[in-house]
Amino acid sequence: MNKIATAEPEREPENDRGQLRSEAASETPAWSSSALPQECAKRHGWPSRLRSYFILAPLIWVYTVVLGTISLTLSFLDRDGGLQHKFARLWSKLVMKTILSPVKVTGSTDFDNSKPKVYAVTHASALDIPILYVYLPFQFRIVFKSELLAYPFVGWHLKRSGQVCINQQNPAASIGAVKSALRSLRKGMPLVIFPEGGRTPNGQLQPFLPGAFFLAIKAEADIDPIALVDTFDLLPMNTYHIKCQSLEVRVGDPISTAGLTVRDTDAVSAKVKSAIESLQSAPTSKSL
């Protein structure tokens, strides 16, 4: 009977393996997983906290109060929100310069708004808003939840600048807002919508609500998926500790809703979520 020969791999001499291990250890980059906790502790320890609490956060509040007051005063002269958008963009530029976090925009960045357009954006941080105002180079309106109206200056600005308020607890009360959003889309004003309905509490993508896709289908608007990368680490919920770092805005290809009906809402939602997950899982750009 013929025997089947099995080849046993050659074993490296013990001293060679030890040399390989030592060489590999010497080549371990500073950002590797073994070095990351210590590196993070150095970068985002107490000096970082003190800078956030006593410099960055107070400066942001000063920008908010001063520019918010001017914007609210001028809102009585400009009812369509165009002037308020410019003030929001100025405020956002000051915030982004203050937090020392460079941003790179990648992907489909031609931003063709010649027809109705909805931008479906991930939401992990309060600083997502200034990032969008700085790096989306056009006028847009944001669909926001009614709870934000309780915040001084921020809520007042949202109410006076033509943004779209949705009451998630009482959808019937939002019928007027939905009609307003549809009118804005059909007139060519792009809408920015956070399909998760709010900030993620853990950095993971949350289930999508149907509202964004209902609006897009009714207006026959294209949907551009956008993933904001590393903003959860920058400033998660329930803290004022801003961890200055490089960020990325990844823009996906437009998803058409032409010829679809509201029965296709779930399918469109799944398609957009899949596109955003692909954007999030792409390798991080090194050239920030």
What are these regions (language model features)?
Residues 2-43, 47-50, 175-288:
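Non-catalytic C-terminal accessory region of glycerolipid acyltransferases
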Residues 35, 39-40, 52-59, 88-144:
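Conserved H-X4-D acyltransferase segment
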Residues 39-104, 156-160:
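A transmembrane-helix-recognition feature enriched in membrane-embedded lipid enzymes
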Residues 92, 163-167, 197-198:
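Short, basic, glycine/proline-bearing loop/turn elements
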Residues 100-102, 139, 160, 188, ...:
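A generic structural signal for alpha->beta connector loops
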Residues 124-180:
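Membrane-embedded segments
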